[in-house]
Design a protein with these regions (language model features):
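Short beta-strand/loop motif that positions the catalytic acidic residue
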Residues: 74, 80-82, 86
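Flexible "cap/lid" loop of the alpha/beta hydrolase fold
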Residues: 1-20, 25-26
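A short, basic/aromatic alpha-helical/loop segment that forms part
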Residues: 48, 64-65, 84-88, 115-119
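Short alpha-helix in the alpha/beta-hydrolase fold that links the catalytic acid
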Residues: 76, 90-99
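Hydrophobic "lid"/C-terminal helical patch
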Residues: 22, 58, 97, 124, ...
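Short, surface-exposed alpha-helical segments at coil->helix boundaries
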Residues: 5, 39-40, 91-95
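Catalytic active-site module of serine/aspartate enzymes centered on a nucleophile-bearing elbow/loop
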Residues: 104-136
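Hydrophobic, aromatic-rich cap/lid helix
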Residues: 40-67
Length: 136
């Protein structure tokens, strides 16, 4: 939690650094090196976002406390999926969420970080497809 709070404090001071650091948390260094157009596209999207609004959303992420009673009301089959190397929304957090949501399945994407749906699209999509095929 302390890391996330420190990150939030740093984001308030330096918009450029916060975007670059976000992308380094979201993608592996190898992916960034090999996929400059994707990196630049997402960087451009972040650049267009209001920094003030970004900070509001991140503040909510930093200080919000989940209400397990509300989460326990979810009864729909649910896939909780994250990259195994996600440092922001850690796999432990997702696994704990899957323990609270009845009828949920927890999966990690090997070598993935926060945007594993982009970086590891094939395995991510296979995992989602298998979940849908087994639960619909």
């Amino acid at each position: 939690k302390r890391q996330v709070i420190n990150r939030f404090e740093m984001m308030k001071k330096d918009k450029e650094v916060s975007k670059k650091r976000a992308l380094s948390r979201w993608f592996t260094d190898d992916f960034i090196k090999k996929n400059k157009p994707i990196y630049e596209k997402i960087y451009s999207m972040l650049d267009k976002n209001s920094h003030e609004n970004w900070l509001k959303v991140y503040k909510l992420f930093v200080y919000h406390e989940d209400n397990d009673m509300n989460i326990k009301q979810i009864k729909t089959n649910s896939l909780i999926i994250t990259g195994e190397n996600d440092v922001g929304s850690k796999p432990e957090m997702s696994e704990n969420l899957s323990k609270v949501i009845k009828n949920s399945v927890f999966k990690t994407v090997k070598n993935g970080k926060h945007l594993c749906n982009i970086e590891c699209a094939e395995i991510f999509n296979i995992t989602v497809r298998e979940f849908i095929d087994n639960n619909v």
